[in-house]
Amino acid sequence: MSDKIFHNLSGKTLVATPHVITKGIYHKSLIYMLSHTEEGAIGLIFNRLVNHIDLKSFFKIKNDEITTPVMVPIYLGGPVEHEKGFFLHSSDYNKNLLLDFHNDLAVSSNLEISEDIAFGKGPKNSLFIVGYTAWKPGQLEEELETNLWLVMDCNKEFIFADNPESKWHNALKHLGIDEIHFSSQIGNA
């Protein structure tokens, strides 16, 4: 058994490779890595727009000052625990953070941030994401070895871009990769 060097990918972005993951939730997905340890990994897909919600109704915000719906996009973060919601947001908002990455991003999961967003007092940029993606120990490392994912540094412009459909293509361009040059064969050279 060989000893492998562990590379922590917390705060990085995973880019799904084309022709490898061709169907389902991970096809052309971008995942912001919340945590990556030798015990496993957790991330949020940030380019799977599924709907728009009214924050006031969804979070049952009881305030007569907000008279019109506050519509925000809702993203599917992964196949695990869809009943859990997270705000992936810029770090200019720092109340009751769940995670702070020190790379201008943070994660919150509380009623206070939804109220602050509804009142226009929330973070400059945010995504509301339900569910998350999780890997067992060694699983992500295996997927990386078989070229299912590319790794790039966090880029807020990709995360908070207006058009979720173009995020994946823009990430490839940022990496200097043209989709048509990918082989449909998997493995290592």
Swiss-Prot record:
Q: Which Pfam families match?
A: DUF179
Tell me a GO cellular component: cytosol
Q: Which domain of life does this protein belong to?
A: Bacteria
Where does the chain cross the membrane?
Answer: none
Entry's InterPro entries?
A: AlgH-like
Checking PANTHER family in the record gives: UNCHARACTERIZED PROTEIN YQGE, UPF0301 PROTEIN YQGE
Q: What family does this chain come from, according to its entry?
A: Belongs to the UPF0301 (AlgH) family.
* Name of the featured protein: UPF0301 protein A1G_00270
Question: What is the scientific name of the source organism?
Answer: Rickettsia rickettsii (strain Sheila Smith)
